Amino acid sequence: VAQDGTGDYTKIQDAINAIPEGSRGIIYIRPGVYEENVYAGRKSTKNKYFSLIGEDKQTTILTSGVSRGKGNEDNTYNDCAALNVYASRFYAENLTIRNTSGNVGQAEALFTNGDAHIFNNCILSGYQDTYKANVGARGYFTNCTIEGATDFVYDGGMEWFDSCRIHLLKGGGYITAPAESGMPMTKVMYPELSADKFYPGLFFRNCTVTAADGVADGAYYLGRPWKETCGAMFIDCKLPKAINAKGWKDWSGSENKASLYEYKSIDAATGSLADVSSRASFSHQATDAEVEAYMNPKFLFAKYKDEPFDYEKILRGAAAPMNFVVTPNEISWESDDNAAGYIIYKDGAFLRFTTDRSLTKDAADDARYSVASVSRKGVVSKAVLASDALRITAFPTAEGFGKYATGGRGGRVVKVTSL
C-alpha cells in the first residue's frame, strides 16, 4: 500500500477488502500517515486472515482523531479506533497505531475482537482507552510500546504483553482497567494458587514502565478493576517512581473480588526489588509456585481455548534468505517453505516486495542488495546482504498455508504503500 500511487493500493482498507475468502493477505505498507478507521475483518468474517507489515514503525502510521468525549457521545469504540481487528489469527508488525484526540475522554486507537492476534514491534498511542481488548479473545504483544494516561489498556480477554514499554503520559491515571476474565480459576482445580479464586486477564511480563517528563511521583496506578471478575498482573516489570506506593486503585467495590497481582516488581531507579510494603490490601503478591505453574502464556492460552495458539512458532517466521548466487545480471537465493515472499532493499532502502526468489539487474549496477524473508503469517526475517551471505542449511516447516490461485508461494501478497 502506498499513498503516492506506487503500490497496488493507496488505502489499507482497499487492500484488506481485496483479500479473497479462504486465504491470508500479507499487506506491506509503505511509510505514511493513514487516517482510515481500518477494519481487519468484520463480525461476519470467518475465513479471511490478515497480516499488516509496516516498513518502519516510526513512519508507518495508522491514525484516528475521533473520540467519544463531550459532543461525540454517539461515537462508538469502533468509530474511534484507527484499527479494528475482527478476523482471527491477525498479525501486525512495524506499525504505529494511534489516536490523537488527547485528553478529551474515551478515544481508542486499537480494538481487538478476533482470537489469537499478535502485535510485534508496534507502537500503540493514545490518551484514554488506547487499547480495548475483548473477552473471549487471546492476544500476544511483544517488543511493543503502549502509551496513554487513563485506563489505556482495558477490558476483558486474555492478553499477554512481553518485553514491552509501557509509557505514562504527562498527568496521572491508571495503566489498566481489566474487565471480565472469561476463565475463572479455583484453588480446587489449580492447587498452587495462593487465593481461592484467580481471574486471569491482562498480563505484563518483563515490561518496562516509563514516565514522560513532568509526571509526578505517585501519579499513576498499575490499574483499577472495571469489573469484579477481572484480573491484571505485572511479572518482573520495572516500575518508575511515578507508580503510586499503593500500586492499585479501588473502583466501586470491584477490587474485593478482582485479581490484581504483582510478582517481583523492580524499582527502575535502583534495579532492586520494588518496595511493595504499602500496596493496597486488596492486591496480591504472587508466589513462586503459582507463577511457575500457571502464569505463562502457553499454559493460559491453552486453558482459555482448545484451538492452538502457538505464538512462538509464528514469531520464528521463515528462514532468512540463504545460498545466494550473484551474477552480473541476476541475484538469486533460497529460503524455506514457510516463506511467502521477500522484501528487497537496494543500498539499504526499500526496493520492492516480491514472491520471486531472484532479482534481475543491470550488469553495471554496483548497488548493495539485501533480502528479507516474509513468512506465511507475515513475520519479517533479518535482511541478508547478498554479497556477504553465507551458505546455511534450511529447515522446512510443516505448517500449512492456503495458496492463492494466481501464483506465488502460498497466500496472496498485496503491497500497500503511502507517502
What is each of the regions a protein language model found here?
Residues 1-330, 337-346, 353-388:
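Sequence-level preference for short, compositionally simple segments enriched
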Residues 1-17, 389-419:
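Right-handed parallel beta-helix/beta-solenoid
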